[in-house]
Amino acid sequence: MISFDMGSGNSNVQEKVPETFQGYVECPVFSEDCSISLEKNHIVLAGRFRHLEVMYGEIITIHLTAYQLTLMTDSGQITISRMGQKLQWLYQKLYAAFNETVLEVFKVTGKALLELTGEYTAKEEGMLHGGPARIRLYEDCLCILPPNENARRLPLCFLKDAVVRNYTYELQMHSGERISFSKLGRELDILDRQMTERLHKLGKKTLEWQKEVAPDISSMQAAYVAGLMPYGRGAQFQKITEMAPSFAAAIDKQIKESRMANTYPWLLELCGGQDFWTGILPAPKQDSLLENMECLQDGNLELSKLSGLLNANKDESTSEVMPEKKAETVLWMLVPDKAKRIAAVELSLTENEAAATYIYRIPGAWEDFAIQIDRALEAGEFDRQLIQLSEEQLRLPENLEKRMLVKRTPALELLRKQFAGRAIHTSMDRWKKDIETCCNNTCITSSEKEKVMEKHCVTCGAKLQAGVKFCGQCGTRAI
């Protein structure tokens, strides 16, 4: 239960936030006095004759002024007022519940190591957003939680640079984003120190995993690979081979013994053996179904979710393309064709996971797009439904959490836009035919590529000329 100081003369006097609030609600459905309560996944607005439940995932923004609380939702605006001091309490409680839902969508686990409040600015592909936000540091990520749909999860394995400058904390991601935090006060140094500690632990975890994959890897080679592909990321196989041959050989051996064994030679032929990316992680624990069965006995698991676990991806049947072998690792390959027009993404997940190759159009430079693919795979935990669901399907109520994740992960939005098709692993001949059909039907012209690669000034919105460092209209530095 959250408690707030009432501001009376006695600082020890506190009043508990009520479970149910009373206020005047105005919305497209009704306008009247309501009882207001917050459940795990939604807010309940109960009038005398009308009843409205709004899922937190439907909320676009939460805005508090001195006299009213405004919720912008997918279906319209909701205004709550006539609550006095309790309006602030409702806002705090709603904001906290909203954030917990977002963190669940991000699949964040474990306890927050640090939580603070400040302001942030994020620059993503020429777009700018920011404002006040809660900031939480976890074992493997930093989460930005504003009171709107612009939340971001920043995996530490994709962090390229972190520096304290002019009382701000500036981050640069390998996937291109630049994020700065300000108005942190004394907690700025604490955040910097905690981030450094987490990065050190990530480096140690990476080295331990490398030794497990390739016991004969040297210390120098391990240090190079750790910088190239921290735990959770993939990297260009050619670079791995040049600097750590033993580690590259270990990955190659794992692929040849995995469910990708039969498709591996053809994928190498597709790219000419050049420029493809690989990644490797330990396989997840196989007790998730058992845990969910226990939850079902306790009444804590929806039947629809259990059905999904038992029947997931039935249409992607596995036969001669993928040998049935026990999965000890998770492997993935990102393979461009020689002309860099399309990319094939091949996964080797758990032994019960159905198999298919996903094809994407390459919108710009291959290396930049490969990083975006890698970022999307990490964010979605290799969930291919996030890519193949149509916009209409994504808007269905049962896909609300997926829609929230896509909206808050630019890399997933990009992959969905560039998705060109898939080749199901039913037979080698069928698989090859599907791949070739996707390749033949997928061709981005030079003008289309230029349009995709267009960048605009984050200040005035003017189109930036290729290669320039400053906007020709307002002089803002290009990012």
PLM region spans:
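Eukaryotic intrinsically disordered, low-complexity regulatory linkers and tails enriched in Ser/Thr/Pro
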Residues: 1-479
